[in-house]
Structure formats: structure tokens, C-alpha cells
């Protein structure tokens, strides 16, 4: 019954958010409730604009909630099950809190590495190895190493491997939340595989300092049409290919 009641509450909240544009004051409180309940900026924007939603609407929700002070706080994961006081660098973000458990210097002496997320076909342990090597190199160069990843199977989610580990989702919203707190020297995407690569263009649009492979180069390699055109312009042979989007194709 708890699952059914929770689902009903979320559905009711979703319907209430849809009335946001007609009552901004009530809408602000709804956004606060929605974030505590786990709604993303994308889901809030979709509830408001529905089929007319565009990427700019999601960004509007983000900027609006920030203007209201609706931002997540950072909490430490208790690795000792409350038996003893635990001060760890094992972190997560939540809207169900008041203050951060850690202090932020904002001195641009840290570098953030985005992990590979869940293992799947085409993205496995090799990207985890790359991420760990990046963390080791960052430390050797005198910077604080920061990892964002959520896969407990990986070596990169061992909090002894870096100065700060955010065990959290690899979405644009959450990554930007962390970057705004950390204010790092830069971010490394190219060691994490597909998921970080998918964020490259949007992070670049927010003027995030992407270290290593640039967002433009990542996009040129990821977009099959752009990559094919580049090979043609360079006179490099390539196999014939087609993009299939339906069964009839």
C-alpha cells in the first residue's frame, strides 16, 4: 500500500506543478516539494510545458529554483553505520537537508573526473581503469581529485582512490550542481565513455572548462554524420553505411 500511496502522491504533485504558470508563489513551493520528492528539472519542465517543452525550459527551471535558493546540499555517507563518528569523503547530494557536511574552498585546485556509470555492452571496466589513472595523475600534479560515479562495482567508486567521491547520478543537472559547489580547475570527460561524452556539448555551453578532448571533437566523433563528412573531406575511405530509424528502413 505504501508504494501505491507514494505513486498517487507523486502523480498528484505532477498535476499540481502543471498549474505553476498561473500561480508563481504557489509554484515556488511546489518546486521545493518536487525536488525533495525526487523530481528532476527535466521532469518539472515537462510537467509545466508538456509536449511544448524545449531544452531552454529545463534550464529556466534550473535558474528559477536557484534564484529561490532551492539547491541540494552535500551529505557524507556514514560508512560505520552510526557506531562511531564518521568523517568521510564519500558524498551524495540531497534536497532533504539544511547545510553541507563538507566545506568548499572555491580555489580551483580540484579537477573533476566523470565516471562511466553502469557497466553495459560497449562500456565496461576499461573506462573505469582510465578514470582511476586520471585520478592518480591529478594527485601527482598537485590537484585534489574528485570523482562522480554511481557504480559500486568500479574501482573508481572506492573513496580511497580520490579526495572526494560523489556517489551520484551522471546527469547534466547533478553534474552542474557538483561543479558549482566544487568550482574546479576543470573537468575530464574523455575517460568515462559514452555517458560523460553525451554531456560534453551541454557542459561546454555552460562554459565548463573541459580538459583533454574538447566538446567539439567529442561531438565530431560521436555524430556519425559529422564523422563521415570529416573522413570524406580528408579523402579517407570508409565502409558504406546508413542510419536506420524504423523497421521499414
Question: Predicted regions: what is each one?
Answer:
Residues 10-33, 39-51, 56-59, 67-249:
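N-terminal beta-alpha lobe that positions the nucleotide/phosphoryl donor
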Residues 1-5:
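Extended, well-ordered protein cores
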Amino acid at each position: 500500500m505504501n508504494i501505491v500511496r507514494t505513486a498517487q502522491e507523486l502523480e498528484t504533485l505532477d498535476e499540481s506543478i502543471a498549474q505553476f504558470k498561473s500561480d508563481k508563489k504557489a509554484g515556488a513551493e511546489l518546486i521545493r516539494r518536487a525536488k525533495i520528492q525526487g523530481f528532476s528539472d527535466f521532469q518539472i519542465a515537462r510537467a509545466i510545458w508538456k509536449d511544448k517543452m524545449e531544452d531552454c525550459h529545463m534550464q529556466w527551471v534550473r535558474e528559477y529554483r536557484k534564484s529561490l535558493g532551492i539547491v541540494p546540499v552535500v551529505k557524507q555517507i556514514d560508512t560505520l553505520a552510526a557506531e562511531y563518528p564518521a568523517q568521510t569523503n564519500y558524498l551524495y547530494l540531497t534536497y532533504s537537508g539544511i547545510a553541507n557536511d563538507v566545506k568548499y574552498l572555491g580555489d580551483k585546485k580540484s579537477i573533476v573526473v566523470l565516471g562511466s556509470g553502469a557497466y553495459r555492452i560497449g562500456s565496461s571496466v576499461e573506462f573505469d581503469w582510465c578514470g582511476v589513472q586520471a585520478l592518480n595523475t591529478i594527485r601527482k600534479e598537485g590537484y585534489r581529485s574528485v570523482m562522480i560515479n554511481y557504480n559500486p562495482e568500479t574501482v573508481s567508486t572506492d573513496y580511497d582512490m580520490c579526495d572526494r567521491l560523489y556517489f551520484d547520478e551522471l546527469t547534466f543537472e547533478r553534474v552542474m550542481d557538483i561543479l558549482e559547489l566544487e568550482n574546479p580547475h576543470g573537468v575530464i570527460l574523455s575517460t568515462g565513455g559514452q555517458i560523460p561524452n553525451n554531456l560534453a556539448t551541454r557542459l561546454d555551453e555552460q562554459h565548463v572548462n573541459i580538459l583533454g578532448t574538447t566538446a567539439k571533437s567529442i561531438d565530431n566523433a560521436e555524430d556519425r554524420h559529422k564523422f563521415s563528412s570529416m573522413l570524406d573531406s580528408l579523402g579517407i575511405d570508409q565502409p558504406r553505411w546508413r542510419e536506420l530509424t524504423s523497421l521499414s528502413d
